[in-house]
């Protein structure tokens, strides 16, 4: 038996470094604060009151990560926007049900804590929370020696929002004849990155290669767009029947999640042009059209179903909110043996 006294630091966990990170991020956390939040960082649990404007508040929760986009961000040492990706993946799932995001928590795990990297990531999380009006109320930073390769870390997020019970958007109001409006994406968002990385591998492309005057890395690591404020504004002023967030599974799997069984979405492929990065991926990876629409958003972040009479108002509101929005299709009756999404 050794007489040497061991400490937690000897085992690879530096509590002082963790405390240093907490001090670094306090300002970022503070700027996301909502009036409903009680207390600050450091408690065993975060306290948050329900907004008083809701008569029958229903809580909506979601959790997500950023997939292997994180691998690309780590390899390219681009840590400042991956946090926005994390928030976007959670809050965009909440808003499709009409829920206003209330608070967010993150989980950051690594083998050896690098305060500069972690602070950059959490600043991005705070940026995303600020964009969505959501309070960053806490999180977990886990330093776990032997669990990760040097320089690697993992991220997960958890978000809770609130919606008036009578105003929940669940797709049951969708009717034949409804119009479908698309909201443009900022890129691949946070889905399909295992295929993206495979395309980079087989094509021999370098992230510094230019595409339309910008390095591939800028196209591929463009932060996921957050639609919360523009959609909250839309649902306050128009009648929205359903919203689909195009994430993993693309068009084929996400749109049917919000459609009644007797309806189908007919998408007009000529209504928009794929952003250059998707054409590049399809060409370099020899990816089929079907697989593209199953894996990527192909330039469409959200699809909104609403009555035809609301289209003009909706497009104007979305444009005022800074969204690229257009009519992408319509809802039709689903025939026997037909798929719920038809792209023509």
From Swiss-Prot:
Ribonucleoprotein listed as a keyword: no
Keywords, in A-Z order: ATP-binding, Cytoplasm, Ligase, Nucleotide-binding, Purine biosynthesis
GO biological process: 'de novo' IMP biosynthetic process; adenine biosynthetic process; purine nucleotide biosynthetic process
Gene Ontology molecular-function annotations: ATP binding; phosphoribosylamine-glycine ligase activity; phosphoribosylformylglycinamidine cyclo-ligase activity
Keyword Nucleotide-binding found: yes
Subcellular location field: Cytoplasm
Superkingdom of origin: Bacteria
Annotated pathway: Purine metabolism; IMP biosynthesis via de novo pathway; 5-amino-1-(5-phospho-D-ribosyl)imidazole from N(2)-formyl-N(1)-(5-phospho-D-ribosyl)glycinamide: step 2/2
GO cellular component: cytosol
Top-level EC class as recorded in UniProt: ligase
EC number: 6.3.3.1
Catalytic activity: 2-formamido-N(1)-(5-O-phospho-beta-D-ribosyl)acetamidine + ATP = 5-amino-1-(5-phospho-beta-D-ribosyl)imidazole + ADP + phosphate + H(+)
Primary location recorded for the protein, binned into one broad class: cytoplasm
NCBIfam families: purM (TIGR00878)
Family listed: Belongs to the AIR synthase family.
Protein name: Phosphoribosylformylglycinamidine cyclo-ligase
Organism the protein comes from: Haemophilus influenzae (strain ATCC 51907 / DSM 11121 / KW20 / Rd)
UniProt lineage: Bacteria, Pseudomonadati, Pseudomonadota, Gammaproteobacteria, Pasteurellales
């Amino acid at each position: 038996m050794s007489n040497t006294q061991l400490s937690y630091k000897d085992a690879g966990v530096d509590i002082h470094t963790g405390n240093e990170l907490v001090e670094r991020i306090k300002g970022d956390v503070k700027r996301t604060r909502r009036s409903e939040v009680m207390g600050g960082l450091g408690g065993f649990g975060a306290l948050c009151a329900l907004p008083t404007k809701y008569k029958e508040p229903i809580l909506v929760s979601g959790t997500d990560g950023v997939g292997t986009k994180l691998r690309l961000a780590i390899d390219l040492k681009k840590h400042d926007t991956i946090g926005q990706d994390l928030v976007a993946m959670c809050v965009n799932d909440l808003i499709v049900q009409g829920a206003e995001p209330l608070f967010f928590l993150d989980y950051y795990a690594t083998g050896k804590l690098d305060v500069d990297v972690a602070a950059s990531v959490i600043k991005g999380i705070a940026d995303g929370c600020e964009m969505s009006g959501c309070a960053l109320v806490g999180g977990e930073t886990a330093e776990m020696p032997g669990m990760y390769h040097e320089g690697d870390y993992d991220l997960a997020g958890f978000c809770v929002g609130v919606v008036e019970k009578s105003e929940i958007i669940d797709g049951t109001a969708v009717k034949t004849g409804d119009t479908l409006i698309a909201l443009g994406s900022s890129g691949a968002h946070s889905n399909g990155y295992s295929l993206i990385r495979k395309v980079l591998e087989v094509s021999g492309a370098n992230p510094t290669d230019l595409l339309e005057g910008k390095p591939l890395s800028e196209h591929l690591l463009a932060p996921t767009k957050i639609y919360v404020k523009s959609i909250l504004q839309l649902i306050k002023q128009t009648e929205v029947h359903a919203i689909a967030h195009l994430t993993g599974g693309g068009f084929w799997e996400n749109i049917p999640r919000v459609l009644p069984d007797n309806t189908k979405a007919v998408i007009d492929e000529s209504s928009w042009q794929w952003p250059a990065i998707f054409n590049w991926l399809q060409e370099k990876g020899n990816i089929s059209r079907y697989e593209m629409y199953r894996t990527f958003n192909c330039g469409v972040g959200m699809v909104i179903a609403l009555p035809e009479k609301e289209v003009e108002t909706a497009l104007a509101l979305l444009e005022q909110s800074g969204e690229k929005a257009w009519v992408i299709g319509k809802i039709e009756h689903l025939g026997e043996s037909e798929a719920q999404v038809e792209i023509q």
